[in-house]
Amino acid sequence: MKTFALITGLFLFTMIAQSLDAQQSQQPPTETIKTAANPTPEQKEVIDLSNTKWDWMANKKVDSLETLFDDKSMFTHMGGTWGKTQELATIKSGGIWYKKAVVYAVEARIFGNAAILLEDIDLQAAVGGHEVTNPFMVTEVYTKENGKWKLAQLTFSHLLRAVKMDSKGN
């Protein structure tokens, strides 16, 4: 009887250990993005435009953003997805105030007349009057029309890493 209990106990222990190991190894793969040391002129143009966009958002320059955002653009936040009109209204009203974005890495990929940017950022914002700082992987999609880049999609994906920005926004 003791042998049976010991074997059963060892079997259960082994099954639990394997189950825990399988759960831990099933974490989604992650790939760290790195800023290119020598971006192409076109990549640099889109990266610079994205950096300017963060400044415009922080300073609530809705007129400049209105020109940058494509009429069919979409914005995906932690709380929902909406179009250009709602995004501009949200910025103008202060519903979301993008106070400061610290970009740690950015990768730009050009596909003909389209560009996809991935940005590893910490975003300091006021949402509904509450100060928040979150780590995000931001995906921006731009399309080139008549020689000018237009923002077509902006998506915030919350990261599991800790915020790197200090309390002073650095």
Annotate the PLM regions:
Residues Q23-T67, M74-N170:
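A beta-strand edge to alpha-helix "cap/lid" segment located at domain peripheries
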Residues M1-A5, Q23:
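Positively charged n-region of N-terminal signal peptides that target proteins for export
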Residues I7-A17:
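Bacterial N-terminal signal peptides
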